[in-house]
A protein has these predicted regions:
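C-terminal substrate-binding/catalytic core of Rossmann-like NAD(P)-dependent dehydrogenases/reductases
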Residues: 49-50, 96-151, 162
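Short strand-turn motif at the edge of the Rossmann-like AdoMet-binding core
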Residues: 64, 87-90, 113-115
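Helix-to-beta-strand junctions that scaffold the AdoMet/dcAdoMet cofactor pocket
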Residues: 77-79
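N-terminal Rossmann-like NAD(P) cofactor-binding module of classical short-chain dehydrogenase/reductase
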Residues: 58-61, 84
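C-terminal capping/lid region of NAD(P)-dependent oxidoreductase domains
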Residues: 20, 54, 84, 91, ...
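Mid-domain Rossmann-like dinucleotide-binding core that forms the NAD(H)/NADP(H) cofactor-binding site
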Residues: 1-42, 46, 59
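Beta-loop-alpha module in the N-terminal Rossmann-like domain of NAD(P)-dependent dehydrogenases
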Residues: 63-71
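A glycine-rich helix->loop->beta "capping" turn
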Residues: 51-59
Length: 186
């Protein structure tokens, strides 16, 4: 229930909880869950997909430590979603097809052990390409990203062959070369 509250405070939407116990499901709703489901329901994964518009959940916090629960989570997590293994899954009571359930959909499994927690919620490569471009252009606009010092020379596109040859063969190739298309003579 603490994980549920942290997720709520972090802005998880929709915030789904699954539990076999109806009293715990009721408590989860009081603590901020948008939907509390019974994982034993035959259509459980379908209920999750419906609640998420067919996408699946972006992040799962698996707190039971039961391998069957992890296997079930792999069926409703979104493509490129994350599953945090807060519960300690020690008994391999459910076979998991890592190729189909983890590799192909790009799911990230995170061992959430007290001793290996990240200090900050930032991981290399977590941003999208769009985020990278937007941030880079913002940094340029406010002068925090300097690109002019990275340009070694400006040349006519007619010298492209020479430029690429130098980039391939030079012991210390130029840092950056810009083609000035105004110099191009057709």
């Amino acid at each position: 229930m603490i994980a549920l509250q942290i997720a709520a405070l972090s802005g998880a939407v929709p915030l789904l909880v699954s539990d076999y116990d109806p009293a715990r499901r009721a408590l989860a709703l009081k603590l901020g869950a948008d939907l509390a489901l019974n994982p034993a329901d035959a259509d459980f994964a379908e209920q999750v997909r419906e609640a998420t518009g067919g996408r699946g959940v972006n992040a799962v916090v698996e707190v039971t430590g039961v391998a069957a629960a992890l296997k079930q989570a792999l069926k409703y997590v979104a493509r490129e979603g994350r599953i945090s293994l807060l519960g300690c899954t020690r008994v391999p009571d459910a076979a998991i097809d890592f190729y189909q359930d983890v590799h192909c959909p790009g799911v990230t499994l995170i061992g959430a052990n007290t001793w290996n927690r990240p200090r900050f919620e930032s991981r290399p490569g977590q941003w999208t390409e769009h985020d990278d471009y937007r941030t880079f252009l913002q940094l340029l606009a406010v002068g925090k990203m300097q690109v002019r010092p990275l340009i070694s020379e400006i040349v006519s596109p007619e010298k492209a062959r020479d430029v690429y040859e130098r980039l391939i063969t030079a012991k210390n190739p130029p840092l950056g070369i810009v083609f000035d298309w105004k110099q191009y003579s057709d």
